[in-house]
Structures are given as C-alpha cells and as structure tokens.
C-alpha cells in the first residue's frame, strides 16, 4: 500500500509515515480517501431514526446509514464532552491522555491522529465545538467555539482571532465548514475535516425557523421516568433529574417579561442572559413562540406529576427541534459533497461525543455507564469498502476512531494507541479475535450533576460497574458494585451483584476489570 516513505521527527523519536499516495492490492495507485467526521454534542442514539423511530425522523443522517454501516454496539470511554474528545484525538483512555474531566486542559503536545495525518500530507481542519481549553494543534485550519459556545450569535476563535458571528450556531458551523471545503483548502491534498456541532447540548435552544415544529406531538413518557433507584446508591445521589434539577428559566425558556418566575438552581440569571444576547429579530421570533407557552404555564400552576410531565414534554420538544436543525445541516453537507464530486472519495462519519438521557430513569444529561449515556451513535459511509445499509454488532468504542483514520490513510498505528481500527469490520464480518469487552471510566466528581466516579466493563450481554470515592462535604464514602444482565433487564433496574445465580459471570467480569486496570495502569478506582 505504501509507495514511498516520509521520515519525520515527532519529539525525540523518528516515526515512519507513508506519503499520501496509496496502492490497492493489485499495485495500482489509488487516490487517498478524504475524511469527514461529523460529531454532535449529546446526540442520543434514541433520536436518530436509523436507530429508533419513536421520537423523530432524521432523513439526512439516515442517508449516511442507508449508504453505509450503522454500528449498534458503539460506546464511549468516558461519557463527558471534553474527555470524550480527548479520547477521540489520541486513541487513549482518559487517564493516559490526561484529560479525565472538564476541569483539565488538553496537552496539545501529545501525539494525535490529526498530527499524524498532517505529517503524512493531509490537510486538516476542525470547525465548531472544541471544548479542550487549549488551542487545537495538528490542524492547518481551526475555527472553534469558545468553551461550550452559544446557540445564538456565538463567538468563534478563527486560528487565534476572536470573532462574533450573528446567527444560529448549527448553521454557522456548517457555513464555516463548507467555506473551508470550497474556498480555503488546498484541493491538491486529501483532507480530514472535523465538523463539531454544539447542538444538541443543553440548553437545547432551537433555531427560530424551527420553533413551531412538533408542537402537537406528545412524547411517550419512559417506563423508568419515575425510577426509585432501589439497589443503586450512586443513581439515587445524582442531580440530573428532570423533575428536581431541570431549571424552568435556563432549560425550559420560561424567562417571563414580568420577572415572576424564579428558580432555586442558581441558573435563572444565565437563562435570562441567553435571551438577552439575541438580536431584536431573534427575540421577536422567540417571543412569538414562547410567550403564549409562558402565559399558559403561569395560569395552570402545575404541581406534582403534571408539572413533571410538562417539563418532560417541553424538554423533548426543544431537543427534537434542535435535532431537526442538525439533520437539515447534515443534508446541506451531503448535498455539497455530492455536487462538488467529493462524495465517493470521502469517508463520512456521523457520531456524538456520548449518549444522552431522554427521560430514562427520570434524567437528562449523561455521565453514567448506564446504556443511554455509555452508548453513542456511530454511522460510517465508505462506498469502496462498506456495503450499503449494513449493520455491525461488534463492540466498538471512541478510542477506535483515531486508529481507524490512520488505517484508512495507510499510516501504522502508534503503540501507545489502545484503540483498534474499525476497518476490519467494514467488510461485514467480525474478526474472530475482535474484543469481547469494553472498559469505561468516569472521573468528574464532585461536579455538576454529582455523578460518582466509577469504572466498569461490558461484554455483549453483561455489565459490571464499580462506584468509588471517599467521604466529602456532599456525600458519604462509596464503594459498591452493580451487575446487570442487559438481555433480561435492558433498563438496568435489577442490580444482580452478589446474586449467587450470577456468581460465575460476576467473577469473570471482575477478572476482566482487574486485568484492564493492571494492563492500562489505571491510577484510581
């Protein structure tokens, strides 16, 4: 596959990389594949119709699945925005890449797949949400949101220069990506573009043109919405409950002009500031939609179950409107790729930095190793290698993305990357030596939502989770385990740990967890 070698120095070590001319198995030169990686923030697999039709139709995202492969057992290594992105870039678990929680600063001097692609002749770019504190490295072009970014009139940092752009973040991010593809890149080089949307991150603010969508839809309340968390100590301590922790003003847009609606979460002022940053035209559209909802809400004086389910419906309506905008913009990108002749020579990936709760267990947000958070969508279109409309059930994780992109470019995976290239799965078969277990580790505690630190392992059917932590001003010490049979208990309600009937399974998973900790030199658990 290699035609010549580029000898480059990275730090003190020389590494050998192939130039960007590849050969097929017959020795005929083939044009290197471009890479387009589209990642949203907190896009649940439940709200992509290629996975689930209960909530919304996403025809443009589905197009990628229909013309490629849908991974049904795709997971993350740490279900939190910054750490997940660090895992993506490095192919390493959080304790190895140094970005364990959102208080950290990503060490941009470490090796990443964009750097290796860049050194091999690719032109690299990242547009949209970065959320790693330090400036991007390994990119010829970067234009990123500051921190979490804002939905309306956000500030971007364009290769070091701060600029505010009027408009809606999802549209702007797409505009910037298409502008780079069309006008700012060297079209003689293969490219790798990371297109990172802020959406649908909290606070789920829809585009003004989408505000009235789904108004008459009543979303089914999850069967676990009123979960009591029996046998699950950490789950009972969290602060991400729609009923208790979702703010009426910040999250649900009840910023009334009379200033009569007040909340106790400390987020009310932030919610009003989100409205105040809008232009007069944006405010007018916003008021036209939300003022009648606010008026009716104040008149109803809801309490108890009625208030809980009103909050759920309001949350779901706004989340789906934001997803509608994402899907529309994915369509814009696909249309451009097709019209510009790039579609067939570009591998297109759609994913999220982690999963998200759509009311399951009464929650919003992510963080836990439970399925809705741990699992993430992954869809790949690669016409030359992947059968259209296919499905892959192998266990995959976001630490696999970096090795995959290197493999596609003909670059040997560095030894430090613990992820595995997904390319062997593209043919439709799972290799016999493919992994049987995944390792997960969450560190961000004490912090917003108060989810305890934990690690664990999952195989194709069972999951073992270990929660740990010393006593602090917020909670008592915790040292407990949870075991789930995902086949008989997909909602993870029945903790089977120390159940004699599952002793052999518990022993097997514990041995695998211990091995991961030793092999990967895990520093806390």
Feature annotation, model-predicted:
Residues 2-480, 490-525:
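Formylglycine-dependent sulfatase
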Residues 483-484:
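Short hydrophobic beta-strand that contains or immediately precedes a catalytic carboxylate
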Residues 487:
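Residues forming the ATP-binding cleft of Hanks-type serine/threonine protein kinase domains
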